Amino acid sequence: MAKKQPREQKIKISPTKGRPMLNWVGKKPLDYVKGYPAVLMEVFDPLKTNLRYDVPKYENLEKNWQNLLFYGDNKDVLATLLEQGFRGKIDLIYIDPPFNVGIDYVRKVQLRGLKTSKIEGEGYSAIEQIMYFNNFLEDTYLQFMYERLQLLKELLNERGSIFVRMDYRFGHPIKLLLDEIFGKENFRNEIVVNRTQEFFKSSRGLKKLMVDTDSLFFYTKSNDYIFHEVSVKREKEIWWEITLPGEHK
């Protein structure tokens, strides 16, 4: 007897704030998503404790969610989390999405007895596997991000925060999307993040100023949010001498 397939459920999505609003060809807010289990789920052991973990069942996912690694389209995974009771339960979200740099990322797969050859009509060899797409049409990319940011908002706790990393290519339009979805009043900071030294080396010889930073956009779900002050202890104390009001030495 064939195994019964899980029934898809329609999960309603809340409307966006709506102002300010960015428009593009094919823009369509998500009204609902179809909830069904993500393709594969594993337990991640970041501390390398070597303890044995059993992959939790979907019906127990809400009570046993630590250190889970999902495989599959992130939109399907977010829909799975919504279906399994995580709406409004997530305190902190960080995403580092594709920047739409115009290049798809691939990895080489070693296959015994197979010579390297190009697949007809494709730009990849037979032993290269696409890791993720990073080459979208502009309108397609904005819709891609729009849908996923809407789902992330559904998962975020009312006192929760989200951090979205972007670079100069689409940082400005993504900021407008975040304003539309989370509300401009819930924007907290644009945090500047330095890039690696490897990027500096690849930028030599360009006839323009080097771009050596990314932006991390910090938004909250509401005005009543959790925030822990960030501070670093100085190795040596520094005394500021004030000579005139507003002037420092």
Region locations from a protein language model:
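Core catalytic lobe of class I
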Residues: M1-K249
